[in-house]
Amino acid sequence: MFNNAVYIIPSASFLNPEIVNTFENFSIEDSKFLKSILYLNLIENFLADEKKADYFFVLDEFDRNFITDEFKADNINLHFADLTKPKLLFENQFLKEFTSHKNNIILSSDIIGINQTELNKYFNLLNIDDECLLIGKSREGTIGVFGFNSYSMDIFNCLVKSDFIYNNFLSCTKTLNHFIHTLNDILLIKNIEHFKQLYIELSQKKSMEYCSQKMHEKFTHLFIEYKELLK
């Protein structure tokens, strides 16, 4: 077991066609495809090289019977949970992992731009004696990265209560004594404006550092299919 742990968690089911939330004007299949390749891109980034942390990949319980072969690889530590009840996930299902690892980082599966190098920077920020939090937020203030070096039920109560909204979380935790590192402008793909930004980001050469050629080709399929939305 490593001192550090990473948890990739989607906001909802995205593989079950009966309940998946369609992404903007995308078809159900393309909505599933977008969410899948965002998630699989993170898996590829974290498992391609020598592991330096324990990884826990979470899917919604309703996706259990719809997982594709890419999620079935032997090296993927897959867990299923009722994502409509994050409080149970944080306070019960992963309590043992949270308390047995020194540093923990929770990532939204909708995030782009994170690789092993970035993760190492995050863990270095958490690797201090004082209790601290690491929060990465989008321009809209949605929390997509949440790291901590000391488990606190009060902190997670605030995280769930805030619905992962940064300002609401700060208001809830103002009486708690944690130092907070804040990362601004992380990119979460939640709507069509973010999809446009994704297109711009992946058009840059530096994107190869966190998105392989294989993954680029998968995203390109969607960019071509929905080119009218990119205007």
Indicate residue ranges for each PLM-predicted region.
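N-terminal nucleotide-binding beta1-loop-alpha1 segment
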Residues: 1-22
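Acidic donor-binding segment of Leloir-type glycosyltransferases
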Residues: 50-77
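Conserved donor-nucleotide/metal-binding helix-loop-beta segment in metal-dependent transferases, i.e.
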Residues: 113-140
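A short, N-terminal amphipathic alpha-helix
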Residues: 35-52
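Short aromatic-hydrophobic micro-motifs that form the base-stacking/packing surface
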Residues: 105-107
